[in-house]
Amino acid sequence: MRRVVCPGSFDPVTNGHIDIIRRAAKQNEEVIVAVLVNVNKRGLFTADEKLEMLREATKEFDNVTVAKFDGLLVDFCRAHDVSAIVRSLRSVSDFDYELQIAQMNYQLSGIDTLFLTANPKYSFLSSSLVREIAQYNGDVSALVPPYVEERLRAKYAELAKKNG
């Protein structure tokens, strides 16, 4: 069985992420979407909130599961019998960074990284851009799944209320 992992911080998950997950699911028997838990980096959403949004966004795919991990991705891959890592490339600058990570992951574990080029309509899209637009009440409906849009609006309303 070919099992692959799509790792990321997904803060929040975007339509670009979903496009890569969809394409990976078509090409592989099983896809694990793995949310990196980085205790040194404070995101907008908690790991559990990210898992919830990802589960909702990927519920149409029978062969996709969602998990979280901390530590090295290759250790997660070994523990879950993953044969390859799937990463998206939006630009040449993505390639430079991703190639270094892929080579290190291979050196550490022998696990290959498969690169999928981003759909051109999502090549500009990033979670940080979505957060910035949503923070100022901009329209993110074309950038994220509907449930994620709702969660973004609720999160920023909660933060505004908290910060007075």
Swiss-Prot record:
Gene Ontology CC: cytoplasm
Primary location group: cytoplasm
Keyword 4Fe-4S: no
Gene Ontology terms for molecular function: ATP binding; pantetheine-phosphate adenylyltransferase activity
EC number(s) per entry: 2.7.7.3
Domain of life, source organism: Bacteria
Pathway this chain belongs to: Cofactor biosynthesis; coenzyme A biosynthesis; CoA from (R)-pantothenate: step 4/5
Necessary cofactors: Mg(2+)
Cellular localisation: Cytoplasm
Site keyed Transition state stabilizer: positions: H17
UniProt-listed Gene3D superfamilies: HUPs
Pfam families: CTP_transf_like
Binding site for substrate: S9, K41, L73, R87
Positions contributing to ATP binding: S9, F10, H17, E98, Y122, S123, F124, L125, S126, S127, S128
One of the GO BP terms on file: coenzyme A biosynthetic process
Catalysed reaction equations from the record: (R)-4'-phosphopantetheine + ATP + H(+) = 3'-dephospho-CoA + diphosphate
Broad class of enzyme this protein falls into: transferase
UniProt keyword Transferase present: yes
UniProt entry keywords in alphabetical sequence: ATP-binding, Coenzyme A biosynthesis, Cytoplasm, Magnesium, Nucleotide-binding, Nucleotidyltransferase, Transferase
HAMAP family per record: PPAT_bact
Family: Belongs to the bacterial CoaD family.
Annotated function: Reversibly transfers an adenylyl group from ATP to 4'-phosphopantetheine, yielding dephospho-CoA (dPCoA) and pyrophosphate.
Protein name per its UniProtKB record: Phosphopantetheine adenylyltransferase
Lineage, top ranks: Bacteria, Bacillati, Actinomycetota, Actinomycetes, Streptosporangiales
Gene from which the chain derives: coaD
